[in-house]
Amino acid sequence: MPEYEIQVPSYRAAALTAEERTRLLARPIQNTQKIRTIVQPIIEDVKSRGEASLIDYASKFEKVQLKSAVLKAPFDDDLMKISPMIKEDIDIAFNNIFAFHSSQLRPTIAVQTMRGVVCQRMSRPINRVGLYIPGGTAVLPSTALMLGVPAKVAGCPHVVISTPVRKDGTVAPEIVYIANKIGAEAIILAGGAQAIAAMAYGISGVPKVNKIFGPGNQFVTAAKMHVQNDYGALVAIDLPAGPSEVLVIADETCNPESVALDLLSQAEHGLDSQIILLTVSLSPEMFDRIQKAINDHALRLSRSYIIKHAIKKSVIVQVDNVDQAFEWSNLYGPEHLVLHLKNASSYIPKIDNAGSVFVGPWSPVSMGDYASGTNHTLPTYGYASSYSGVSTDSFLKYITTQELTEEGIQRLGPTVIRLAELEGLTAHADAVRVRGVRL
């Protein structure tokens, strides 16, 4: 087989032990203790000094001198100057995301569990939400849409965005335009752990939020986990999102160029990104065409350096059959799963663990990343085995009610008295007895 400048290491599944398979599917290891020691002092500084600390961090990290670290709505039109074409593109994406997330709203449910006993579940929007929009290696208005639109659909009364400024001290106008469109009340000019702390604890003029959303690097993720575990913050987070990742399953019917670019589109996100390709019964010629396409496209792309670094932690595995491919995929639990398979949709029932799935030759990850309507804020680092991606539900909380009639408590009361006494909780039992229930 030819050698290429950029080549993903490849293996045959049949030649691997269970331990070797585990090693190949391992994510890049992060030194969490070291990250925490960096993040915690920043969080404490923001708690104690508020906006002044954000101004100092902007000077330190972005090399920008800010007079204020907050933009308040209504936002000046000059801050939202974007081309008509980009405005139209954002509006199309907004509408698709809005349509899909609106369909997720659920009516109040009411169930009579037995005669005289009615239980309900109703939703309420989270009052104050904070949306973190990264800005390190790329401007990400798409993330502003993915977080802002479901917040609007859910009806969250107070929305705050936090995003780092550009080199000139301004926020990308696309993000300001989206902030205005979703009804955000403020934009905090900060990135990293300091942004998470500002939203979790509040700063002058911007009260603390109840829940924080948004992807980010290892420092952002560590900060989110820290504030979630701080009872003084009383703040929830969406999910522990880490580096971008994709797993592609491809058979002989695939287009090598499409496979290569689906892989590279995630590799270009960051140095810690990871890509995995599982090939099913590929001929040597088709396998080489994919490797060549990866090399050729990677060398010409603007973020070639990042891709080269990410590929060092990536792998191609030649599996024996489709069932084995899905066994590997479910073990890995990818953020993005792409199916370059004949009759791809027929394999959806085999998927147990994945953030979002891209089915067939016409469904690149890019569509979900920007505008198909699904959400691109997804669980990574294996959390797809226990977490879902961001949805409208993420911005809602559910409250249950129960209402009993006199007949209902007489029917159900004896059961509750006996169960309460079994647990030794006599006040529970007496709260039923005092209402006239007797065994």
From Swiss-Prot:
Pathway: Amino-acid biosynthesis; L-histidine biosynthesis; L-histidine from 5-phospho-alpha-D-ribose 1-diphosphate: step 9/9
Catalytic activity: L-histidinol + 2 NAD(+) + H2O = L-histidine + 2 NADH + 3 H(+)
Entry's EC annotation: 1.1.1.23
Biological processes per GO annotation: L-histidine biosynthetic process
Cofactor: Zn(2+)
Principal EC category: oxidoreductase
Alphabetical list of InterPro entries matching this protein: Ald_DH/histidinol_DH, Histidinol_DH_CS, Histidinol_DH_monofunct, Hstdl_DH
GO MF annotations in UniProt: histidinol dehydrogenase activity; metal ion binding; NAD binding
Binding positions (substrate): 244, 266, 269, 336, 369, 423, 428
Pfam entry (one): Histidinol_dh
UniProt key word GTP-binding: no
Cellular component terms (Gene Ontology): cytoplasm; cytosol; nucleus
UniProt binding sites for NAD(+): 132, 194, 217
Record-annotated active site: 335-336
Keyword entries, A-Z: Amino-acid biosynthesis, Histidine biosynthesis, Metal-binding, NAD, Oxidoreductase, Zinc
Cofactor note: Binds 1 zinc ion per subunit.
Domain of life: Eukaryota
Residues binding Zn(2+): 266, 269, 369, 428
Similarity field: Belongs to the histidinol dehydrogenase family.
Function, in words: Catalyzes the sequential NAD-dependent oxidations of L-histidinol to L-histidinaldehyde and then to L-histidine.
Protein name per the record: Histidinol dehydrogenase
Naturally occurring in which organism (per UniProt): Schizosaccharomyces pombe (strain 972 / ATCC 24843)
